[in-house]
Curated annotation (Swiss-Prot):
Family: Belongs to the bacterial ribosomal protein bL31 family. Type B subfamily.
GO cellular component: a single term: ribonucleoprotein complex
Keywords: Ribonucleoprotein, Ribosomal protein
Classification via NCBIfam families: L31, PRK01678.1
UniProt GO MF annotations: structural constituent of ribosome
InterPro entries registered for this protein in UniProt: Ribosomal_bL28/bL31-like_sf (IPR034704), Ribosomal_bL31 (IPR002150), Ribosomal_bL31_B (IPR027493), Ribosomal_bL31_sf (IPR042105)
GO BP annotation list: translation
Pfam families for the chain: Ribosomal_L31
Name used for this protein in its record: Large ribosomal subunit protein bL31B
Amino acid sequence: MKPGIHPDYREVVFQDMSNGFKFITRSTIQTRETIEHEGKTYPLAKIEVSSESHSFYTGQQKIMDTAGRVEKFKNKFGARANGKAAAK
């Protein structure tokens, strides 16, 4: 392997932001934050979903608020969206 061209492969703590679950694995991800875990400092990568919170693995469903998304879009961008569509 050529020196200096490969990313740093190191232990990183991934934290599930939906439930606070943390796990250590090896990764090349670049992060600015660090965390103290078991007396050692590791880079911290924050993630939205992990196997601890995903409905496929937990067997529980989370209800997402998707109702009214089209209406919100129309209220926010209605005039501009209609104007651009007509101009084409």
